[in-house]
């Protein structure tokens, strides 16, 4: 039921009205509504009960284990939310003068410096508003670098076949042709195939390390040397930085440009479509091309860098400084943990992943790369169960909902058949991990004894299994007011 379905004429929720009505004097008449908007007429109690009931039907990090692979669904500390909502931060308008925003500018400047230290980069821009935008920005800087050198023959970006789907999309948006590099039997980039691919057309390579296969790229120094010798650059997709935070830095591996997902590694809330933050970091050769705005020191204070300060900048990704509320939460998270705490993030994330992987293998599951240890996540394949019992990865994921666990990522990476990608993160305790193993083991037994039960799951959720094909082809995404009843 929608909130509109609870509407009854004459009901109101006056306690939630704005304290100061908007002043519409001076607005042109043609911009003003002639009729009231079709908003629901409900009481405060109606509103509270409606949204409380909805929250109880949902999975969330605050209520459930959320092992969504490649998403780092860790707990978001409430202290970061409280501090980022302070009036001094929240009431600052982006068009306000620098003089009245020195506190915010100070935090953003320090965040830039922290991210430089953690990644081994020369400079950082906070302006990208999401990971995919950070990717686009990074590839755009690679293009600007080659164009500035009149090296226009470089029209290819190399992308591993296990990469995030946004990697080839970002490269294509910047006008590059995408050349796919296969993965070898151990889960690493096939070095021989890479040697055949690099050449005078190579603008760069996009890598995630650890990769989306959940393993650390063993031969990253050799990859960096190959691409650099060919005149290309290395792009680091920071989706999996949680596994190496404070342990090893992308800059030290040879990467020239990176993007970070603050809404993942640095624990800002995500999962509802945004907002996110995807800062980019670069080494010295790409520093002139960083997007604006950026924060710089100015005497005893701080200021925004403008286009006149960076004439070679690729420009702006948005009118203002990205999602500042998200940036502030990440800043507080770093300050709360400190460098030793950030190292423990990586240690506990990898410990939890390896413990969970070992327990699930003991329970009878197959991993994608049995000879490799997990980084911060790992991949199971239920292809054997599909052949023997006609159950799929989707069936396992749907059935997990009945046991009170959010489903892992399914069918990604694409090269692993019937896969579930599981990322427990560092914030889960052993009891939760053991309960998840027990649920998976019970489902594995059901797959052999009652496969049809899995095929119809979930059974205990407010909404049962959907017709996903129909939902994709005929989406119903917005409420529309009913047509007025014509007079008799």
Curated annotation (Swiss-Prot):
It holds the Pfam family GcvP2_C. The keyword tRNA processing does not apply. One of its GO terms (cellular component) is glycine cleavage complex. One of its GO terms (molecular function) is glycine dehydrogenase (decarboxylating) activity. It catalyses: N(6)-[(R)-lipoyl]-L-lysyl-[glycine-cleavage complex H protein] + glycine + H(+) = N(6)-[(R)-S(8)-aminomethyldihydrolipoyl]-L-lysyl-[glycine-cleavage complex H protein] + CO2. Keywords: Oxidoreductase, Pyridoxal phosphate. Its cofactor is pyridoxal 5'-phosphate. GO terms for biological process: glycine decarboxylation via glycine cleavage system. PANTHER family: GLYCINE DEHYDROGENASE (DECARBOXYLATING), MITOCHONDRIAL, GLYCINE DEHYDROGENASE, DECARBOXYLATING. Belongs to the GcvP family. C-terminal subunit subfamily. The glycine cleavage system is composed of four proteins: P, T, L and H. In this organism, the P 'protein' is a heterodimer of two subunits. This is Probable glycine dehydrogenase (decarboxylating) subunit 2. It comes from Methylococcus capsulatus (strain ATCC 33009 / NCIMB 11132 / Bath). The gene is gcvPB.
């Amino acid at each position: 039921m929608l909130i509109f379905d609870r509407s009854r004429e004459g009901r109101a929720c006056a306690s939630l009205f704005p304290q100061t009505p908007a002043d519409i004097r001076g607005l042109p008449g043609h911009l003003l509504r002639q009729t009231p908007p079709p908003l629901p007429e409900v009481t405060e109690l109606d509103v509270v009960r409606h949204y409380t009931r909805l929250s109880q039907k949902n999975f969330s990090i605050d209520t459930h284990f959320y092992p969504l692979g490649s998403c780092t669904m860790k707990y978001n500390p409430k202290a970061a939310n409280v501090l980022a909502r302070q009036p001094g931060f929240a009431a600052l308008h982006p068009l306000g003068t620098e003089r009245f925003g020195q506190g915010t500018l100070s935090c953003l400047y320090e965040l830039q410096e922290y991210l430089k230290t953690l990644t081994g980069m020369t400079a950082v821009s906070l302006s990208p508003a999401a990971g995919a935008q950070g990717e686009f920005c990074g590839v755009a800087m690679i293009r600007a670098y080659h164009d500035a050198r009149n090296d226009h023959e470089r029209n290819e970006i190399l992308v591993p076949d296990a990469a995030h789907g946004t990697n080839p999309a970002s490269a294509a948006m910047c006008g590059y042709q995408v050349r796919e590099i296969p993965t070898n039997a151990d889960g690493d980039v096939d070095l021989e195939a890479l040697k055949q691919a690099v050449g005078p057309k190579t603008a760069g390579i996009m890598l995630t390390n650890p990769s989306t296969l959940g393993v650390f790229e063993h031969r990253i120094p050799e990859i960096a040397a190959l691409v650099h010798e060919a005149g290309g650059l290395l792009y680091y997709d920071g989706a999996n930085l949680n596994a190496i935070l404070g342990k090893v830095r992308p800059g030290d591996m040879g990467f020239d440009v990176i993007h970070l997902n603050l809404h993942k590694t640095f624990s800002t809330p995500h999962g509802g479509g945004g907002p996110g933050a995807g800062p980019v970091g670069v080494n010295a050769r790409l520093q002139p091309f960083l997007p604006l705005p950026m924060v710089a020191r100015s005497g005893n204070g701080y200021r925004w860098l403008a286009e006149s300060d960076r004439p070679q900048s690729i420009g702006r990704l948005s009118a203002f400084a990205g999602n500042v509320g998200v940036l502030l939460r990440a800043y507080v998270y770093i300050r709360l943990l400190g460098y030793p705490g950030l190292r423990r993030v990586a240690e506990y994330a990898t410990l939890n992943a390896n413990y969970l992987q070992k327990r699930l293998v003991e329970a009878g599951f197959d991993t994608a790369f049995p000879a490799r240890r997990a980084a911060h996540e790992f991949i199971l394949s239920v292809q054997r169960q599909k052949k023997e019992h006609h159950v799929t990865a989707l069936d396992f994921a749907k059935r997990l909902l009945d046991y009170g666990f959010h489903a892992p990522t399914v069918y990604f990476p694409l090269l692993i058949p019937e896969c579930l990608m599981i990322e427990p993160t560092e914030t889960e305790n052993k009891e939760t991990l053991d309960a998840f193993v027990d649920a998976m083991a019970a489902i594995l037994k059901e797959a052999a004894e009652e496969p049809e039960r899995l095929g119809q799951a979930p059974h205990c959720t407010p909404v049962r299994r959907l017709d996903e094909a129909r939902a994709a082809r005929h989406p119903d995404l917005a409420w529309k007011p009913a047509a007025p009843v014509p007079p008799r």
